[in-house]
């Protein structure tokens, strides 16, 4: 996977060919035309999808939802216009193939996910689809045939648990079918049913096709953070490891409900105070971890008092979520 600085359409549109198809550019002596053509096309592609899936300040494309499906169908339409071979796997992932000279060789795959987080960034996932599509489009226009099959992949439901890729590998677990992205979301099993997907093959442990048929999978991705974007020199990063994620979706801190003006401090059992102190302690541990040279993150994404809470009532409980991420599994688990 490559990570690109956010909001840089030129990098998104051109990095794939510059880094992985440089030989083709040298042979064609047409790199300037490629950059100009792909940058303009990618900008239009991003805007087209943004309009389809706009949600407040960002975009929302939930896994196996209608907006994600619109992205997949838009990509399929583009692939058909380019004359690419179109197919879907058992998890609903889309594959668009530009045939190579030797079709007996394992294929090069490149792509990313069509979904997003709620009110997320438009380039998340979409950049990794735009880049190989731009490369395929350019090769079709210039009548360039790659040495082996080149396949653009559009994955489903990555943000909810990488279920597009997991389904391809046959590694979905039975308990996953009852998982929800949010408390109000349908379960994964219900989402599968809504798209006519049979979950049984996705839990078989057998990949949808032999992995030996894949020579490489290349994913370009925006950084989703400020490090590369704030650097004058470092604009492209190579991923050296994938973080493990430990999620506590609901932690409950119990207290005692009471009137705000009637209970002095020594007699209070305030869950908001206790939860805040606990989060503050996590913050101190995080700082100490970073100072020791180790890398991890934690995030409290949700913190709520009960629906019938009021400004003048000490609540009886607080619920919160914690997301802990680290490359070192033992470090991650020590926080969990």
Name each model-derived stretch:
Residues 139-160, 291-301:
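Short helix-loop-beta-strand segments that form the rim/entrance of peptidase-like active sites
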Residues 115, 161, 166, 170-329:
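Midchain, well-structured core segments that form catalytic/ion-binding scaffolds
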Residues 14-15:
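Intrinsic, low-complexity polybasic segments
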Residues 51-99:
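A non-catalytic alpha/beta surface segment that caps or lines the substrate-entry region
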Residues 133-141, 277-284:
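Short glycine/serine- and small hydrophobic-enriched flexible loop segments
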Residues 78, 82, 94-127, 132, ...:
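Catalytic-core environment of secreted peptidases
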Residues 21-59, 99, 314:
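N-terminal hydrophobic or amphipathic helices/low-complexity stretches enriched
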Residues 329-335:
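Short, conserved charged micro-motifs
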């Amino acid at each position: 996977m490559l990570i690109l600085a956010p909001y840089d359409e030129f990098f998104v549109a051109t990095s794939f060919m510059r880094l992985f198809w440089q030989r083709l550019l040298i042979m064609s002596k047409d790199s300037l035309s490629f950059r100009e053509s792909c940058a303009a096309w990618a900008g239009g592609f991003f805007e087209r999808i943004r309009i389809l899936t706009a949600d407040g300040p960002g975009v929302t494309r939930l896994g196996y939802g209608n907006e994600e499906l619109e992205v997949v169908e838009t990509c399929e339409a583009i692939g058909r216009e380019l004359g690419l071979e179109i197919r879907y796997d058992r998890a609903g992932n889309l594959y668009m193939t530009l045939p190579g000279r030797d079709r007996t060789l394992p294929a090069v795959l490149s792509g990313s996910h069509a979904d997003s987080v709620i009110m997320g960034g438009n380039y998340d996932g979409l950049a990794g689809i735009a880049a190989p599509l731009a490369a395929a489009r350019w090769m079709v226009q210039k009548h360039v045939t790659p040495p082996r099959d080149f396949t653009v992949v559009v994955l489903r439901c990555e943000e909810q648990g990488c279920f597009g890729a997991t389904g391809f590998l046959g590694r979905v677990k039975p308990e996953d079918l009852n998982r929800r992205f949010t408390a109000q979301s349908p379960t994964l099993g219900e989402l599968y049913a809504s798209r006519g997907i049979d979950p049984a093959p996705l839990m078989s442990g057998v990949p949808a096709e032999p992995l030996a048929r894949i020579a490489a999978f290349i994913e370009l991705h925006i950084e989703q953070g400020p490090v590369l974007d704030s650097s004058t020199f470092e604009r492209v990063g190579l991923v050296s490891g994938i973080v493990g994620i430990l999620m506590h979706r609901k932690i409950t801190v119990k207290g005692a409900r009471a009137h705000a003006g009637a209970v002095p401090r020594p007699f209070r059992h305030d869950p908001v105070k206790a939860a805040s102190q606990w989060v503050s302690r996590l913050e101190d541990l995080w700082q100490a971890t970073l100072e020791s040279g180790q890398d991890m993150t934690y995030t409290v994404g949700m913190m709520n008092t009960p629906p019938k809470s009021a400004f003048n009532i000490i609540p009886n409980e607080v619920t919160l979520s914690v997301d802990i991420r680290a490359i070192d599994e033992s470090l991650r688990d020590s926080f969990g």
